[in-house]
């Protein structure tokens, strides 16, 4: 949004008006229909006091403007001004009385007799006053510290073979986007889920980066919380640093994720009869790690992906009704079309997977099949592309075998958005819009990337394209033969990433000793003595190299319905802000484990990933600088982890060895045996922009409007190379107000910016929406009260019915209910989950035999009374009914009489 100040010729007709006048008018009603707010409009014409309703009612404000030629009006809820004659929003440089200053607000340095107090506007009395942004909020580089006083140089004590955790935590701690989020937006680390890992991590980051710089701290609380969730890390045995990283980031994502509502437009080229597999947000998925495309790992992952464990205690399960399902389908259709339109191809959905298409050369007419893989479904959507050139198909022909993280995965999408996720809010389109539920967190914002992979059948030329979200790249370390193929430019030899396994060899204590000898000798002997040097670019090239699918690793073509020879490879569609690279040094077999100790050369600056970028990718920055590296010394069965990290405040490298922190040279880091590397996008332009905005904040001019902006987005602006469009939706509801649940800590969510800063940020990054006034949403408050009343009523009725059921001596009928669904319902009525569950789903506990529904043996089910079942079923619907009837034993009256006689005789004795 650009600024329209002094471009509206009707500003001269505005009369003098004070904030008290606007507040008084906002408490009134429309002068014609008597309807009350919100969203009343006040006429700004000189000596006109008219107040009318907006478009949500009869729109008397527009009628008043047409009849009286009074063109300027102000929304009494948002304080935004609209000119009917110019048909645009205008910004006032004068006319509104200067409001009094707000107390207890940070003030930046005053220059040219201008203070921050000139920019404040009155806040909602029910909300705490947000702080005004200062230079430190916009530019991390203003925190110039002396080298001897640099923060972040605090060690971590080893509390029982926990060097793997200490190295991982130090590596994450030196990732500025994540650490700065917890330091600047610590108020957002809120969760009702146990064991509240985000709060323990916040406390740890505060201690590590405190100005007092303690020598070392003990991460006991964080470690205890992780052990509670993941039993893998219990005990005192050595664990894997990368697995710990995955577990920690999964837990942080689960606790910090927020549901985001996006408006999606329905593509005009699609009809309602076309069906597409249901899609959910990729950020709700437990993050994946892109593994190398070896045949053995591919088979292992495919076999392991058929069934996933479910965390029924904490996981929010979203069961969509038919309308939600249609919205998800339409959303997915648009994502497919966005990708196809980028390839300049015509799109036509075909429901018949086995449609016979004429197969010709790739340079002429080609049929490409886009597979949308849903983990909860095996349905596949076929999208046929016509006139697709070879250059648009082959560069993305590689399938990636995802390796799931340590924590239980959730169902989710393999289709992150191909188009920019944030668009300027404009209502000019006449297309029907859909709402789509999406989840995001600071973890997904920082570490999520997208890989586009494809497999081509060499018989029918069908190409299967898949998009997958990754959190880290697991790269193979190529051997001598692989390096020769990679470095050969005379012939396009296909390099198989899986062949790197030949570099493994059994190791023992002798190898442990020889490793240190070799490390010393390597530094003294020329590299040609040991053979070719393996670089990180070689590992990336091996990962992204084309791979033949033949022999035991043939491709199962769905068009041919047979195993066929194929070729696969992949490219990156979207690079993350911080790229986590895992070098596959360990291989764990059934009887033994091995380790590759090959030195991999990696750059400290200027890692160029352009060769691995998809041609149609919108990515602009593909150069990365190293932040930290985790190293492992020893063998696969024993060893020690350390981390080398670059301090962001003084740009010096340090070795973090448990509680010991030592400055090291760059050459020491480059000679390290890297295991996990963290690279950050590099952008001089972003640093210049931060300095420019920071300088503007110190010399800002007075303005009458103050803008509120998300702290989370400001953290992105402060630490990201590509912060993306401004997003204020993290503190706004869908109605434009403050959600009642966030009202108590609104000061932790937003900062105030003067108008000139907002204009500069908005003109460069777009996004929004613009917010000039904070108020608690009345509509959300009513909905919240309704949902709380519903929770209370359902819980009370269930307790009463269940108590009556427990008092029955011998109930004739039991109704079985899925405990998975019941846990979701229990989380809802107890206030742990904001959304009610979907329909009752007993399909997992039911089995049909001889035409009747019976309880499946060993099913995770509970027993309730018929009255309780009818109560829940009347609210949520679903089924099927699973009824248990205890067998009735018929006793012969003569036998019963004889037993009673014996009992009487026994008592008489």
From Swiss-Prot:
The UBP-type zinc finger binds 3 zinc ions. However, it does not bind ubiquitin, probably because the conserved Arg in position 55 is replaced by a Glu residue. Deubiquitinating enzyme involved in various processes such as centrosome duplication, cellular migration and beta-2 adrenergic receptor/ADRB2 recycling. Involved in regulation of centrosome duplication by mediating deubiquitination of CCP110 in S and G2/M phase, leading to stabilize CCP110 during the period which centrioles duplicate and elongate. Involved in cell migration via its interaction with intracellular domain of ROBO1, leading to regulate the Slit signaling. GO terms for molecular function: cysteine-type deubiquitinase activity; cysteine-type endopeptidase activity; G protein-coupled receptor binding; small GTPase binding; zinc ion binding. The keyword Protease applies. Zn(2+) 1 binds at residues 8, 10, 83, 86. It catalyses: Thiol-dependent hydrolysis of ester, thioester, amide, peptide and isopeptide bonds formed by the C-terminal Gly of ubiquitin (a 76-residue protein attached to proteins as an intracellular targeting signal). Residues 421-436 have a biased composition (Basic residues). A zinc finger (UBP-type) spans 6-109. Residues 154-682 form the USP domain. One of its GO terms (biological process) is protein deubiquitination. This is Ubiquitin carboxyl-terminal hydrolase 33. Its EC number is 3.4.19.12.
